[in-house]
Amino acid sequence: MAFETFSVALDKDKTLIFETGKIARQASGAILVKMNETWVFSSACAASLSEAVDFLPFRVDYQEKFSSAGRTSGGFLKREGRPSEREILVSRLIDRSLRPSFPNRLMQDIQVLSYVWSYDGKTLPDPLAICGASAALAISEVPQNCIIAGVRVGLVGGKWVINPTRDELSASKLDLVMAGTASAVLMIEGHCDFLTEEQVLEAIAFGQTYIAKICDAIEAWQKATGKQKNFSAVLDMPEDVQNVVSDFIREKFEKALSFRDKEALEQASKELEESVIANLVQEENSDFSLLNVKAAFKTAKSNQMRALIQDLGIRVDGRTTTEIRPISIETPFLPRTHGSCLFTRGETQSMAVCTLGGENMAQRFEDLNGDGAARFYLQYFFPPFSVGEVGRIGSPGRREIGHGKLAEKALSHVLPETSRFPYIIRLESNITESNGSSSMASVCGGCLALMDAGVPIKAPVAGIAMGLILDRDQAIILSDISGIEDHLGDMDFKVAGTAKGITAFQMDIKIEGITHKIMEQALAQAKQGRSHILNLMTQVLASPKGTVSKYAPRIETMQINTSKIATVIGPGGKQIRQIIERSGAQVDINDDGVINIAASTQESINKAKELIEGLTGEVEVGKVYNGRVTSIATFGVFVEVLPGKEGLCHISELSKQKVDNISDFVKEGDKLAVKLLSINEKGQLKLSHKATLED
């Protein structure tokens, strides 16, 4: 392929430049996207499957090369390896944006790789990666139903900003990443400072105008330079197969839908599928293959569930479209934790635990912008027993990381300032039962665990997951969706926030986008559900507890002059190690001179403060100190008046009477009251015990 390029101007100093034909020419599609000095490369390749499967084997991997920012990893291994949390989250953004664009029953193994090759420290690479991955697929042979693009939207100084820079984003009240086609939204994810539903809709509409502009440019470029699409890899569903399967299960599945609990419904559905396979699969007839019959069964189930909702307004568990499942709350739940809550909504349950600690408990991370530490972090655990299965236990999967980060963002906006509450906060959400909306249960349970731990949050936060049934030109929004509704429905729209406004949201679409009107309806219905849940939460725990748990460490802060930081640390950290050893407290010093002292007892904190004040305190001429004799010489004694500060009390200043033998007057280690007479130009202290004696 010859070298080709095109550009899309978004705003001043924000122009997307797409290039192909120079790099990775053996890939099915390869694109280099540039904005200023941030460059992101994306490739798309596909391979034929050795055997047909009933899912789309689509994999996205995004990697930020440290060399792109002129850095190397601070770890022992300098080669990029296991993806970081941020890389996994961006990989998920790309995957969720692109997945709805593929045709149903596409029998290809598809891989998209994205690498950050150059990073200027200003232009954020994730929206470039979404656009680059989409463009790489667009010019490849991989079949797609639509072209997509992605952007980031911020709210800075009351104005919407497209693809905000890193500095703009730090001042923004909104961080929204969204993707869609030229006419509809496919994916959104973001968090914000208590924006209203109307503001979020306005932000989405603002971003959609730029998405349409990018999509139109990619589509025009595809028509001019793209490869022929390989639609032969898409399997058709024979109409008679779908009809036969639908007729076979109609009455039987209607009976299965009468079961209101998840386990009974799943068992009935499993038995029905086995019956369908046993009766309808025909080895001699390829139309009635196992793959086709299973796909037709899934479609028939979905259609029947949808019909129940559309015709009767009743869902599979008997609820109306706006009804929330029964909620029970127990807090505190665990006796020795700093804060805990058992939050149950229907058959979804989260055991949330809050742990408070000092600076050493912060979550360290490393990315293109350097090293950092998270003051607050939420970790989500989804063991296989929560859905009655046997499975792998180990490092978290992409889904666990994504769900945890969404809940973390939802709660981060209500945390107090560090100056008011200096603790490091770790939240964990242990999903002990799951039937949909477990990430939003993590938000609710996590909020209550924070309140139980005595974290003075600004307001309670609740979350709810919304679904969509879109058929017959009719859009039905479902509140608090269950697992089967998530699986067979058209949308998963999670919204979290306070009574005042939204703090986080995430939407995934399985169809080719939804309209502004549907999102408006979903957000309005989500607000009603959120208010209901918040009311139940505040009935159990109206406000955060006034004090932290007796099992939590005590933390106090003190401020010192930045010029004294080196004094407190000492050569090679000697001084601060001595403070920690002598006090039993954990001491952490920030670059701004703020010192955090954490200990299990108040006595340890007081001892550490005393030692630090001694090191950083300034001696005053004329002041009397109760010092300690550190050494004795023939001409006088050296007395430590403050930790690390010694002065000389000459033999003539020891007493009003003549002292012949100093050792007869005072011993090393004795306490001795001395008055500071003067400080010479070298900083040496002249002390007098005689001056403290009464006439």
Curated annotation (Swiss-Prot):
GO terms for biological process: mRNA catabolic process; RNA processing. Keywords: Cytoplasm, Magnesium, Metal-binding, Nucleotidyltransferase, RNA-binding, Transferase. It is found in: Cytoplasm. Involved in mRNA degradation. Catalyzes the phosphorolysis of single-stranded polyribonucleotides processively in the 3'- to 5'-direction. Residues 622-690 form the S1 motif domain. GO terms for cellular component: cytosol. Gene3D superfamilies: GHMP Kinase, N-terminal domain (3.30.230.70), K Homology domain, type 1 (3.30.1370.10), Nucleic acid-binding proteins (2.40.50.140). InterPro entries: ExoRNase_PH_dom1, ExoRNase_PH_dom2, ExoRNase_PH_dom2_sf, KH_dom, KH_dom_type_1, KH_dom_type_1_sf, NA-bd_OB-fold, PNPase. SUPFAM superfamilies: Eukaryotic type KH-domain (KH-domain type I), Nucleic acid-binding proteins, Polynucleotide phosphorylase/guanosine pentaphosphate synthase (PNPase/GPSI), domain 3, Ribonuclease PH domain 2-like, Ribosomal protein S5 domain 2-like. It is an enzyme of class 2 (transferase). Its main location: cytoplasm. One of its GO terms (molecular function) is 3'-5'-RNA exonuclease activity. It comes from the Bacteria. This is Polyribonucleotide nucleotidyltransferase.
